């Protein structure tokens, strides 16, 4: 089997996992994203997962499978934020897959956001993708962003209680947040529930997927608000990470 035929078969399997298939334009944007990440990676260290199925499975599939609910209604207009976007993923993959969405990518590291801004420009997404260089704790307290998003996502940023404090304040009353996790167990669920009780949130669903080629099991935890998040969250810069809300004394420190 030629490499081209092998890749085509693997690509088909990826879309089968998602029960969704990109349009020719979207597929071209994914290919262009891979090219741009490769180019920028020669200048700064964005990600090692660029070539072959490191990109298509560990980046594109892993970015999109947790939002299969949204892929079913890809023409719906929604407002999305990707917290701790790093090299621009999962946010850019989601923005490409949901062509009527408006997406905000946020990271505190300037060299990464500078590269991501250029990638957004080259992809032709400037009209609906915004890149911010800022600490999440500060953005989450700004009126412009607080309680304004339909979907908040984060991948490989922090433990679940910390992620919840980052994500919940961004949500509209009807919004949901999706935490992309590798490890997930009963203890982490218990810790998350403690944090959500303070944030006025709840767990909606938990799903898992074993990535092809033995690339590991991934988990997607969807959470939402039961009422507006209390104004004191997220706390000051660095505090959510140092004193996560599953710690009973965290609010007093």
UniProtKB/Swiss-Prot annotation:
GO terms for molecular function: rRNA (guanine-N7-)-methyltransferase activity. Its EC number is 2.1.1.-. It holds the Pfam family GidB. Its main location: cytoplasm. It is found in: Cytoplasm. Keywords: Cytoplasm, Methyltransferase, rRNA processing, S-adenosyl-L-methionine, Transferase. S-adenosyl-L-methionine binds at residues 84, 89, 136-137, 155. One of its GO terms (cellular component) is cytosol. Belongs to the methyltransferase superfamily. RNA methyltransferase RsmG family. Specifically methylates the N7 position of a guanine in 16S rRNA. HAMAP family: 16SrRNA_methyltr_G. This is Ribosomal RNA small subunit methyltransferase G. The gene is rsmG.
